């Protein structure tokens, strides 16, 4: 009986070859999966350039889980080294370079956020690697060897670089290193498959070239669509405000997903759920509610999904996040650590301070890392959501 690869086909934009490859398409990947005598090593890398992962990032993670469930090894690379350069893909100017401390703090939250997606428990199904393991050890000779595998012309063919060069916007030499470093990650972990968004085709192709250079069999590149945000217009992005964060309160998730435009619903179901597309309700409003329910259930469980649904149906526009009145604060300015104790999110100011230092406190989804954070006036906090860990929230109100 032929193996069912419907999980592989769902939501894929492209399984790509280099021009010289005759069989690097989805059928040859299926053949490799069906005949391999060992688990394939399936790579996905994410740079901790911010504290949050949103639903757009979950798409390759979900495909990675599909490979795990088929018996293969997911290699999740936390790009703690490459994050300090920043991927120039799609950028019209150089990214701000992060400090080592920025990256370390951001990386702390990533594994907790993806735990509901990936299989962390089955032996041999997951490796978590930090690319500083190998990239920080590259000497000048090895870096020169990597640089010698590509030409300036090849780099300028990359869409973001080409646009900037045409507009005479600066391109800094260290930015040319990013595709080579991402590619070298594939060499270091001996990847058989690399997952990425459609905007990552160039970088994944560089990985294939470097694997050939170092005598390895080149990886398959599996490209996945870029998720359009909740506005139905631009790609999901925190900076555009059209995102749903994995760390958000269940009620907030539910409310946002109920508002996904009708024309985007099928894409959301295909990329973010396992529900059969041909079994979806015909009514767009029913589809929106089903989408919200299904995704909240994935990340928070059925009870949380039911509570979020009931809150939305009863007119709870803020997703039933408990409220704390700032009138109960004796005086301002006030320290955030004190507020954590006063709201009951922590047992005391001291515990609040420790939670901040551990990276477990967020305000409107943004992690707060300074234990001495002070707010001067109540207006600074009106309507904002204070969070400790994954499941403790309050909305601050006047």
Curated annotation (Swiss-Prot):
PROSITE patterns documented for this protein: AA_TRNA_LIGASE_I, S4
Segments forming domain S4 RNA-binding: 334-398
Species of origin: Trichormus variabilis (strain ATCC 29413 / PCC 7937) (Anabaena variabilis)
Keyword Glycoprotein set for record: no
GO molecular function, one term: tyrosine-tRNA ligase activity
Enzyme class: ligase
InterPro entries referenced in this protein's UniProt entry, alphabetically: aa-tRNA-synth_I_CS, aa-tRNA-synth_Ic, Rossmann-like_a/b/a_fold, S4_RNA-bd_sf, SYY-like_C, Tyr-tRNA-ligase, Tyr-tRNA-ligase_bac-type, Tyr-tRNA-ligase_bac_2
Protein name per its UniProtKB record: Tyrosine--tRNA ligase
Gene3D superfamilies: HUPs, RNA-binding S4 domain, Tyrosyl-Transfer RNA Synthetase
Subcellular location: Cytoplasm
């Amino acid at each position: 009986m032929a193996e069912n690869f419907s999980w592989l086909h769902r939501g894929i934009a492209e399984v790509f070859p280099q021009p010289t490859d005759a069989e690097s398409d989805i059928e040859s990947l299926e053949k490799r999966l069906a005949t391999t005598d060992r688990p394939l090593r399936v790579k996905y890398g994410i740079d901790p350039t911010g504290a949050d992962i949103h639903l757009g990032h979950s798409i390759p993670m979900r495909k990675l889980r599909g490979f795990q469930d088929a018996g293969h090894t997911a290699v999740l690379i936390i790009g703690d080294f490459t994050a300090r350069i920043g991927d120039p893909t799609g950028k019209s100017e150089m990214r701000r370079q992060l400090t080592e401390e920025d990256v370390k703090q951001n990386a702390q939250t990533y594994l907790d956020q993806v735990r509901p997606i990936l299989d962390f428990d089955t032996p041999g199904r997951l490796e978590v690697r930090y690319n500083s393991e190998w990239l920080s050890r590259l000497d000048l000779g090895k870096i020169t060897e990597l640089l010698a595998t590509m030409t300036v012309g090849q780099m300028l063919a990359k869409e973001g670089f080409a646009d900037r060069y045409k507009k005479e916007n600066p391109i800094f030499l260290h930015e040319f290193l990013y595709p080579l470093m991402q590619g070298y990650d594939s060499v270091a972990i001996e990847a058989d498959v690399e997952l990425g968004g459609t905007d990552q085709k160039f970088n994944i192709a560089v990985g294939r070239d470097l694997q050939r250079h170092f005598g390895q069999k080149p990886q398959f590149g599996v490209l996945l669509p870029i998720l359009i945000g909740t506005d139905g217009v631009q790609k999901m992005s925190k900076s555009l405000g059209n995102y749903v964060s994995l760390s958000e309160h269940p009620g907030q998730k539910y409310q946002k997903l109920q508002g996904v435009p009708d024309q985007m619903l099928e894409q959301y179901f295909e990329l973010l759920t396992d529900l059969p597309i041909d079994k979806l309700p015909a009514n767009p409003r029913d589809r929106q509610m089903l989408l919200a329910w299904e995704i909240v259930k994935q990340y928070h469980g059925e009870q949380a999904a039911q509570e979020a649904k009931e809150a939305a149906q009863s007119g709870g526009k803020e997703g039933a996040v408990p409220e704390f009145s700032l009138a109960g604060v004796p005086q301002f300015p006030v320290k955030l650590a004190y507020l954590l104790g006063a709201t009951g999110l922590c047992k005391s100011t001291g515990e609040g301070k420790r939670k901040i230092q551990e990276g477990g406190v967020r305000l409107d989804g943004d992690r707060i890392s300074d234990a001495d954070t002070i707010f001067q006036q109540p207006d600074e906090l009106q309507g904002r959501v204070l969070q400790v860990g994954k499941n403790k929230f309050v909305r601050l109100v006047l």
